[in-house]
C-alpha cells in the first residue's frame, strides 16, 4: 500500500468526481443537495454537444423533482419534444408502421408517480444540472484531465491538469467517484473486469435537417425504429419535424462480410443516402449537420468499488440505447451512492454502509444490461431472437419496481419468498423493505403533494393515522442517535391528509403501523402494526440500516 500523502495538497475535498458528463454532474448535484462538498473534473471544455441520452424515466424525474429541477426540465423538454410521444417501428417513414411498442409515453403513470416521462436532449439537460449543482456549492472544472490517482487506504490523492494552462494541482479526497465512461481509466487502474453480451453494433448517429412534416403530421412520436433492407436504426425528431437524428446500427457480428460498417469510410454522401432510405423518399432534401460514431455494447463491471474508489454510470455498466436505460440507470447510481457517502461523511453511518452501494446497484445494473439487450433484439434485430434472449420486464417494473437487498434493508421474516427478487411490479411492492416508497397523493397545508415530496434529505418515519406514538418515538430516537429524523402521521383527517385513502394499503400497514424511509427514498424497515416498544424498535432499526 502506498504511504499517505506527506506534502499538503493544493485542494482538499470530501469527494472528487472524475467525469463531468450527466452522471458526474448528477453525483455532484446530489452530494451538494445532501450538504457534502464535491468537486468534479471533466476533460471536455463544456457540457454535452450532442443529444445522446434523451428518454428519461419516472424515477429519474422523481429524483430531479427532489432537487427542484422537475419544472425546468419539463419546460425545456416541451420546447423541443411532444410531451407524450410514442415509440413505434416502420419500414420507412413513408412506408407505414410495422409495430407499436408504446402508444403514449405517459399512459397510466398517474397511479405510480407524481412525475411524467419525457424526452430531453442531453445537451439541454446537462447545463440545467450544472447550474443547479453550482448553485448548491459544487466545484465543477472543465478542460481538466486526470494525471494520476493513488488510493492509500486513508484517502485518495489525485493529480489534475488544466488543459489550457498545463498547470497541475494535487487534490486530496476521502473518496473518488469514477464516472468516466465505459472506457474508464479508473476501472482499468483497479483491475476490474467486465462481462456481458459485449459489442453488439458499430453505430453512427447522423444529425440532419429534412422536412418530414407531411410524413409525420399528427403522429407525435418520440422514437421511430426503422427496419428495411438498407439499414436498421432509429429516428428521434424534434417536434418541428424538420430536424433530428438517425442512429444506424450494424446487426450481428460487425466484422462479418457484407456488414454495414459505419466505423470507417463513412462519407456525407453515405449519410444522406441512409437518411433518405430511412425516410423512404429518395429525392428528399437532406442537410447533414454532424455524424458521431459509437459502439453499442452490453456489459457490466465485476465490481463497483475498489477501496475508496467507486464506479458509477457507464464506468460500471454500458447498455445499447434501446429502452433509454443508460443515462437513467447512471443517475440512479449517483443518487444511491451520494446518499450513502453523505451519511458516512457526516458521521451518521458506519463505513460499512458504503459496501451496500455495490450490493444494491450491481444487481440492478445486471438486470438493466439484460433488458436493454432484449429490447435491442426485439426492436431492431428480431431475426436474432431465440430462447437465450431475456424475457421482457415491463417498463413500470424496470423504472419503479427494482428492489434492494443489503444490510441497509431489514427484510421481514414472512418476505423470504420474494427476498431475492431484483424486480417486481410497483403495484405489488406493497411497502416491502428494499422497495421504493410508493407514491400516494396527499394534501398538505392546502396544497396537493405526493408522499415523495416528504422525502429526500433525511430518514423519514411515515405512520398510519393511529401512529402518533411512532412520531413521538422518532423524536426520541433522533436525539439518542444524533441524526435528523422527520416523522409524519398520514390519515384522512391529519395535517398530512391521505386524500384518496390509499396510504395504508400502498405501504402494507395497519392504522398503527409505520415505515422507515431512507434518504434515497427506499423503504429500510417497517412495522406493520404497533410495536411493543416503538422507540426501541425504531432505534434498533436505524442502528442496523446505518451499519453502526
From Swiss-Prot:
It is an enzyme of class 1 (oxidoreductase). It catalyses: 4-methyl-5-nitrocatechol + NADPH + O2 = 2-hydroxy-5-methylquinone + nitrite + NADP(+) + H2O + H(+); 4-methyl-5-nitrocatechol + NADH + O2 = 2-hydroxy-5-methylquinone + nitrite + NAD(+) + H2O + H(+). PANTHER family: BINDING MONOOXYGENASE, PUTATIVE (JCVI)-RELATED, TRK SYSTEM POTASSIUM UPTAKE PROTEIN. SUPFAM superfamilies: FAD/NAD(P)-binding domain. GO terms for molecular function: FAD binding; oxidoreductase activity, acting on paired donors, with incorporation or reduction of molecular oxygen, NAD(P)H as one donor, and incorporation of one atom of oxygen. Keywords: Aromatic hydrocarbons catabolism, FAD, Flavoprotein, Monooxygenase, NAD, NADP, Oxidoreductase. This is 4-methyl-5-nitrocatechol 5-monooxygenase. Monomer. Gene3D superfamilies: 3.40.30.120, D-Amino Acid Oxidase, subunit A, domain 2, FAD/NAD(P)-binding domain. It comes from Burkholderia sp. Involved in the degradation of 2,4-dinitrotoluene (2,4-DNT). Catalyzes the removal of the nitro group from 4-methyl-5-nitrocatechol (MNC) to yield 2-hydroxy-5-methylquinone. It can use both NADH and NADPH as electron donors, but prefers NADPH. Also able to use 4-nitrocatechol as substrate. The keyword NADP applies. Its cofactor is FAD. Belongs to the PheA/TfdB FAD monooxygenase family.
Amino acid at each position: 500500500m502506498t504511504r499517505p500523502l506527506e506534502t499538503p495538497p493544493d485542494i482538499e475535498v470530501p469527494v472528487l468526481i472524475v467525469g463531468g458528463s450527466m452522471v458526474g454532474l448528477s453525483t455532484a448535484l446530489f452530494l451538494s443537495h445532501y450538504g457534502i462538498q464535491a468537486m468534479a473534473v471533466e476533460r471536455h471544455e463544456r457540457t454535452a454537444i450532442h443529444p445522446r441520452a434523451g428518454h428519461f424515466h419516472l424515477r429519474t424525474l422523481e429524483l430531479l423533482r427532489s432537487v427542484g429541477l422537475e419544472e425546468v426540465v419539463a419546460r425545456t423538454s416541451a420546447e423541443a419534444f411532444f410531451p407524450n410521444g410514442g415509440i413505434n417501428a416502420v419500414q420507412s417513414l413513408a412506408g407505414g408502421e410495422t409495430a407499436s411498442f408504446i402508444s403514449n409515453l405517459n399512459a397510466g403513470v398517474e397511479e405510480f408517480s407524481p412525475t411524467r416521462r419525457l424526452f430531453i436532449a442531453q445537451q439541454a439537460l446537462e447545463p440545467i444540472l450544472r447550474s443547479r449543482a453550482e448553485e448548491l456549492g459544487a466545484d465543477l472544472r472543465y478542460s481538466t484531465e486526470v494525471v494520476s490517482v493513488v488510493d492509500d487506504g486513508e484517502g485518495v490523492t489525485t493529480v489534475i491538469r488544466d488543459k489550457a494552462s498545463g498547470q497541475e494541482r494535487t487534490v486530496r479526497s476521502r473518496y473518488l467517484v469514477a464516472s468516466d465512461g465505459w472506457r474508464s481509466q479508473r476501472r482499468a487502474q483497479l483491475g476490474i473486469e467486465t462481462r456481458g453480451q459485449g459489442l453488439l453494433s458499430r453505430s453512427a448517429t447522423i444529425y440532419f435537417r429534412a422536412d418530414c412534416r407531411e410524413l409525420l403530421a399528427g403522429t407525435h412520436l418520440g422514437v421511430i425504429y426503422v427496419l428495411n433492407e438498407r439499414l436498421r436504426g432509429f429516428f428521434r425528431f424534434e417536434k418541428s419535424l424538420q430536424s433530428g437524428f438517425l442512429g444506424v446500427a450494424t446487426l450481428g457480428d460487425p466484422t462479418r462480410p457484407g456488414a454495414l460498417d459505419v466505423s470507417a469510410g463513412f462519407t456525407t454522401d453515405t449519410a444522406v443516402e441512409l437518411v433518405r432510405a430511412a425516410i423512404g423518399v429518395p429525392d428528399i432534401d437532406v442537410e447533414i449537420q454532424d455524424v458521431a460514431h459509437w459502439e453499442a455494447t452490453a456489459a457490466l463491471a465485476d465490481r463497483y468499488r475498489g477501496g475508496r474508489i467507486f464506479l458509477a454510470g457507464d464506468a460500471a455498466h454500458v447498455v445499447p440505447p434501446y429502452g433509454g436505460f443508460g443515462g437513467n440507470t447512471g443517475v440512479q447510481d449517483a443518487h444511491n451512492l451520494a446518499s450513502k457517502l453523505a451519511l458516512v461523511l457526516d458521521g451518521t453511518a458506519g463505513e460499512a454502509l458504503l459496501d451496500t452501494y455495490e450490493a444494491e446497484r450491481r444487481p440492478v445494473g445486471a438486470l438493466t444490461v439484460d433488458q436493454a439487450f432484449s429490447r435491442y433484439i426485439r426492436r431492431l434485430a428480431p431475426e436474432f431472437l431465440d430462447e437465450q434472449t431475456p424475457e421482457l420486464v415491463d417498463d413500470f417494473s424496470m423504472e419503479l419496481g427494482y428492489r434492494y437487498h443489503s444490510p441497509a434493508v431489514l427484510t421481514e421474516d414472512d418476505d423470504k419468498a420474494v427476498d431475492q427478487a431484483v424486480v417486481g411490479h410497483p403495484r405489488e411492492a406493497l411497502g416491502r423493505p428494499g422497495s421504493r416508497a410508493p407514491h400516494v397523493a396527499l394534501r398538505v397545508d392546502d396544497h396537493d403533494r405526493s408522499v415523495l415530496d416528504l422525502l429526500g434529505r433525511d430518514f423519514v418515519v411515515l405512520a398510519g393515522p393511529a401512529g402518533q406514538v411512532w412520531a413521538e418515538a422518532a423524536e426520541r430516537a433522533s436525539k439518542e442517535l444524533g441524526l435528523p429524523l422527520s416523522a409524519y402521521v398520514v390519515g384522512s383527517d391529519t395535517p398530512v391528509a391521505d386524500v384518496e385513502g390509499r396510504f395504508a394499503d400502498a405501504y402494507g400497514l395497519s392504522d398503527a403501523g409505520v415505515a422507515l424511509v431512507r434518504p434515497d427514498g427506499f423503504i429500510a424497515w417497517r412495522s406493520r402494526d404497533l410495536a411493543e416498544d416503538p422507540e426501541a424498535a425504531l432505534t434498533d432499526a436505524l442502528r442496523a440500516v446505518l451499519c453502526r
